[in-house]
From Swiss-Prot:
Transmembrane segments: none
Matches recorded under NCBIfam families: L21
An MF annotation (GO) of this entry: structural constituent of ribosome
Protein name: Large ribosomal subunit protein bL21
Organism: Xanthomonas euvesicatoria pv. vesicatoria (strain 85-10)
Keywords noted in UniProt: Ribonucleoprotein, Ribosomal protein, RNA-binding, rRNA-binding
Subunit note: Part of the 50S ribosomal subunit. Contacts protein L20.
A GO biological process held by the record: translation
Main function: This protein binds to 23S rRNA in the presence of protein L20.
GO CC terms of this entry: cytoplasm; ribonucleoprotein complex; ribosome
Family in the record: Belongs to the bacterial ribosomal protein bL21 family.
Amino acid sequence: MYAVLVTGGKQYRVAQGETLRVEKLEVEAGNEIKFDTILMLGDSDGIKLGDALKGASVTAKVVAHGRADKVRIIKFRRRKHHMKRQGHRQHYTEIEITGIAGGDKK
């Protein structure tokens, strides 16, 4: 069984036992978190699809928090002797999917 969940403004296709990185969540490592905004559920019988499936949820365990590799940004204006360098490291939360519960379409 798999599901498509929404967190941090992004959609993720997940299955039980998978580990993935999502936008930073304010939950301590080792705690469980429940995602209620599920857009799709699928298994061998077919799929359930909707804006938000009523009663559907995905539970996950927070494994760790971290920061991604640095992305370097350079802004350059030709012939003006102007160059601006900047870097960015995005915070993330690593989660492990522990369960997927089905539901009815709203």
